[in-house]
Curated annotation (Swiss-Prot):
It comes from Coxiella burnetii (strain RSA 331 / Henzerling II). This is Large ribosomal subunit protein uL5. This is one of the proteins that bind and probably mediate the attachment of the 5S RNA into the large ribosomal subunit, where it forms part of the central protuberance. In the 70S ribosome it contacts protein S13 of the 30S subunit (bridge B1b), connecting the 2 subunits; this bridge is implicated in subunit movement. Contacts the P site tRNA; the 5S rRNA and some of its associated proteins might help stabilize positioning of ribosome-bound tRNAs. GO terms for biological process: translation. The keyword rRNA-binding applies. Keywords: Ribonucleoprotein, Ribosomal protein, RNA-binding, rRNA-binding, tRNA-binding. Gene3D superfamilies: 3.30.1440.10.
């Protein structure tokens, strides 16, 4: 069993159950999935950008990404419906916990000028989204072999019903959220 999964079952679940007064263990919020998304507008000019971004995504997530396509044509962005414009990966179960461990302990501390994650990035239903500007914060990506610095969006979906429950869950996992008072 994955380290964070064990932590969740043995310590986080009883703590949150007591804190929020849940009657059942199944009512305690848990992680559902983590979604990584890379929007690649520059793929319009160079089709190889998608392949290189997919290679980075495979190294980071350990799973093959799904290519996302433009839904409709947009003259302002010079794209047509059906053109590839990004890639995404959905992580669940063991891979999700492995990725979360690497994100919390390795990748986030390597972000330049990092002072904590914004507590305002919750969506109202306990899910948290964050953006990473450089994919090189992950140790799997070798700096010398990177053709371009690309960012990505990471969304952590939980079963929490409120932001407060989601915040307590992520704090218990060791997420470096800033205090709301500042």
């Amino acid at each position: 069993m994955v380290e964070l999964q064990e932590l969740y079952k043995k310590t986080i679940t009883p703590t949150l159950q007591k804190e929020f007064g849940f009657k059942s263990v199944m009512a305690v919020p848990r992680l559902e999935k983590i979604t990584l998304n890379m929007g690649l507008g520059e793929a319009v000019a160079d089709k190889k950008v998608i392949e290189r971004a997919m290679d980075d995504m495979i190294k980071i997530s350990g799973q093959k990404p799904l290519i996302t396509y433009a839904r409709k044509s947009e003259a302002g962005f010079k794209i047509r419906a059906g053109w590839p414009i990004g890639c995404k990966v959905t992580l669940r179960r063991d891979r999700m916990y492995e990725f979360l461990k690497r994100l919390i302990s390795i990748a986030i501390p390597r972000i330049r000028d990092f002072r904590g994650l914004s507590p305002k990035s919750f969506d109202g239903r306990g899910n948290y989204s964050l953006g990473i500007r450089e994919q090189i914060v992950f140790p799997e990506i070798q700096y010398d072999k990177v053709d371009a610095i690309r960012g990505m969006d990471i969304t952590i979906t939980t079963t929490a019903r409120t932001d407060e429950e989601g915040r307590a869950l992520l704090k218990a996992f060791g997420f470096p959220l800033k205090d709301e008072s500042r």
